[in-house]
Amino acid sequence: MKALSKLKAEEGIWMTDVPEPEVGHNDLLIKIRKTAICGTDVHIYNWDDWSQKTIPVPMVVGHEYVGEVVGIGQEVKGFKIGDRVSGEGHITCGHCRNCRGGRTHLCRNTTGVGVNRPGCFAEYLVIPAFNAFKIPDNISDDLASIFDPFGNAVHTALSFDLVGEDVLVSGAGPIGVMAAAVAKHVGARHVVITDVNEYRLELARKMGVTRAVNVAKESLNDVMAELGMTEGFDVGLEMSGAPPAFRTMLDTMNHGGRIAMLGIPPSDMSIDWTKVIFKGLFIKGIYGREMFETWYKMAALIQSGLDLSPIITHRFSIDDFQKGFDAMRSGQSGKVILSWD
């Protein structure tokens, strides 16, 4: 079958032929319809330090997708041929304390689709049936294909009560923009997002944020004053991994504020811990999606009127995958969809 693979330990990704995957007793075989390019896929394309330490070569990559069930393992229940599904990209062990306690998103033995095992940039994908999620009929293939990153946004945004709160989102990448849209949709008062990429800030404006602030040109404190905010932000969603952005967040949080961190900062990032201590801040690390509470919330948010369509900016046939990666690497895109039909 046709697949996009990391074939060489260097920059790039290549179209190749690989054998169709075999279906185990507890697996589903999924015929892929659409995939989306993740920032992780760009890291793998660029062959950065993380990729060199993590990705086996050769490897079929990709983990954002929607497809149709075309094969079912003999032990599987609850699915049928023809079901439209996406799936959780974190494969968990099922036997550690967190898995047995129902906190599967915190499994210490997680493996990743398209990272540690073959991914979805292929005509067919096999995953454990446990990881598959049926897509409601009134959710499009395009939106279903970005449920993985949307889930990161939902998990981060809904970590804390947002109703009537003032929310700061640092980082206007696709996940940050979607998190800001979720916060506004569920009833936050002011949702302010910061970045230095004007293209992506404009996407955030299209998604309905209160203010999208280019911190290279505008002072966040001035924006807060303009909005009548006298005590700081109640909730911070750190999506950038940029040390200056996190330090600004600590400066502008209200006392007792709550921060959810999805962005991955450098390991040697230094901050003024007195601001965390004397403000009584609560900081929560976010990894992936809660299984499967986040998935049900994603579907419900879209069905209740949350419009994510502006975040999908580019669509290509899989044969034009290079154009898709070029768009993602340029920084002048939202989500990029590759069609396998």
From Swiss-Prot:
Catalytic function, reaction form: L-threonine + NAD(+) = (2S)-2-amino-3-oxobutanoate + NADH + H(+)
Entry similarity comment: Belongs to the zinc-containing alcohol dehydrogenase family.
Positions bound to Zn(2+) 1: 38, 63-64
Positions annotated as active site in the UniProt record: 40, 43
Pathway: Amino-acid degradation; L-threonine degradation via oxydo-reductase pathway; glycine from L-threonine: step 1/2
Organism whose genome encodes this protein: Salmonella typhimurium (strain LT2 / SGSC1412 / ATCC 700720)
PROSITE patterns per UniProt: ADH_ZINC
Binding site for NAD(+): 175, 195, 200, 262-264, 286-287
Assigned keywords, A-Z: Cytoplasm, Metal-binding, NAD, Oxidoreductase, Zinc
Subcellular location: Cytoplasm
Entries under Pfam families matching the protein: ADH_N, ADH_zinc_N
Gene for this chain: tdh
GO biological process, one term: L-threonine catabolic process to glycine
A single Gene Ontology CC term: cytoplasm
Function statement: Catalyzes the NAD(+)-dependent oxidation of L-threonine to 2-amino-3-ketobutyrate.
SMART domains (UniProt xref): PKS_ER
Keyword hit for Hydrolase: no
Record keyword Hydrolase present: no
Protein name: L-threonine 3-dehydrogenase
Site annotation Important for catalytic activity for the proton relay mechanism but does not participate directly in the coordination of zinc atom: residues: 148
Record: residues binding Zn(2+) 2: 93, 96, 99, 107
GO molecular function, one term: L-threonine 3-dehydrogenase activity
